[in-house]
C-alpha cells in the first residue's frame, strides 16, 4: 500500500500457517534497504508486513506530522490484521526499529490488542532523540521549535494510554553507547508498560552509536523475536 506518509509490503508464505510480524523500518530507511533483515525473519518462519515512513515526518520540522503518521499506520495495521485473521492467521507480533519502535509503542494495548508480543529495537524520548540529531535540531530550531516545545507537542505520544497489558511480552534492544536513545533513559519508557501488566525484558546490543545499535538489533532480529514470542525456547 502507498500513502503520502508511508508505504507497506508483505513478505513470506501464507500467514495462515505462521505468525505474522508487523515490521516498521527505522527512520529514513526504505523497505528495500531492510530486505536482508526482513528475509531473515521470513526464513525464521514469520509472515512479515513491512512499513517504511516518509523522512518528511522530521525533515519538514512540523510536529503535527508525527501523530498523523502514527494514526494512519495504526489504521492500516488494524485493516491488515483483520484481513489476515479472516484468512486464518491467529498470532500477531511486531518488530520496530528507531522511529518504527516509537510508532509501535503507540500501537500496543488498547489501540491494537492483537499485538501481544514483539520487539522494540531501541527506544526512548522521541523529542530528545530528534533534538540529539544535529541536522534535525537545526531544521526545527529554524522553525521556532525548542526541545521543551517538542516534548509538549508529543507528550500524548510519549505517554500513551495502554490500558491493560496483562499477558503481553515485549523485548527492548538498546545500547548504553547509543547517544540518540541511550540505555540509561530506557526505564522511563518501560515503566508505563510494566505498570500496565506487561512482561518486559531488556537486551543490550554491542554498538558505538544509535545507527549501529539499530543495525545490531536488526541482525539479531530472529533471536529477539523468539525472546518475545517463546521466551522458554531461547
What is each residue range found by the language model?
Residues 64-86:
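Alpha/beta-hydrolase active-site loop
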Residues 179-200:
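Active-site-adjacent alpha-helix of alpha/beta-hydrolase-fold enzymes
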Residues 1-16:
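N-terminal cap/lid segment of alpha/beta-hydrolase-fold proteins
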Residues 130-135, 140-186:
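The feature captures the conserved acid-bearing segment of alpha/beta-hydrolase catalytic domains
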Residues 14-54:
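Short, surface-exposed "cap/lid" segments of acyl-processing enzymes
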Residues 106-148:
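Hydrolase active-site cap/lid region
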Residues 95-104:
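Gly/Ala-rich beta-loop-alpha elbow adjacent to hydrolase catalytic centers
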Residues 196-234:
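C-terminal catalytic histidine-bearing segment of alpha/beta-hydrolase fold enzymes
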Amino acid at each position: 500500500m502507498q500513502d503520502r506518509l508511508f508505504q507497506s509490503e508483505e513478505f513470506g508464505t501464507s500467514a495462515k500457517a505462521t505468525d505474522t510480524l508487523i515490521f516498521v523500518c527505522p527512520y529514513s530507511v526504505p523497505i528495500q534497504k531492510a530486505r536482508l533483515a526482513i528475509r531473515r525473519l521470513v526464513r525464521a518462519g514469520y509472515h512479515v508486513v513491512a512499513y517504511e515512513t516518509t523522512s518528511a515526518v522530521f525533515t519538514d520540522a512540523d510536529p503535527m506530522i508525527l501523530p498523523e503518521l502514527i494514526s494512519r499506520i495504526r489504521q492500516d495495521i488494524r485493516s491488515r490484521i483483520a484481513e489476515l485473521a479472516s484468512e486464518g492467521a491467529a498470532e500477531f507480533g511486531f518488530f520496530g526499529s528507531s522511529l518504527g519502535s516509537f510508532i509501535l509503542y503507540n500501537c500496543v494495548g488498547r489501540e491494537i490488542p492483537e499485538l501481544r508480543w514483539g520487539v522494540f529495537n531501541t527506544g526512548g524520548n522521541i523529542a530528545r532523540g530528534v533534538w540529539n540529531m544535529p541536522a534535525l535540531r537545526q531544521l526545527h530550531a529554524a522553525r521556532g521549535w525548542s526541545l521543551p516545545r517538542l516534548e509538549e507537542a508529543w507528550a500524548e505520544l510519549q505517554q500513551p494510554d495502554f490500558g491493560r497489558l496483562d499477558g503481553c511480552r515485549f523485548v527492548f534492544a538498546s545500547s548504553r553507547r547509543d547517544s540518540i536513545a541511550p540505555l540509561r533513559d530506557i526505564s522511563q519508557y518501560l515503566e508505563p508498560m510494566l505498570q500496565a501488566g506487561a512482561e518486559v525484558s531488556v537486551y543490550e546490543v554491542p554498538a558505538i552509536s544509535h545507527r549501529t545499535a539499530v543495525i545490531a538489533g536488526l541482525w539479531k532480529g530472529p533471536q529477539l523475536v523468539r525472546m518475545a514470542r517463546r521466551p522458554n525456547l531461547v
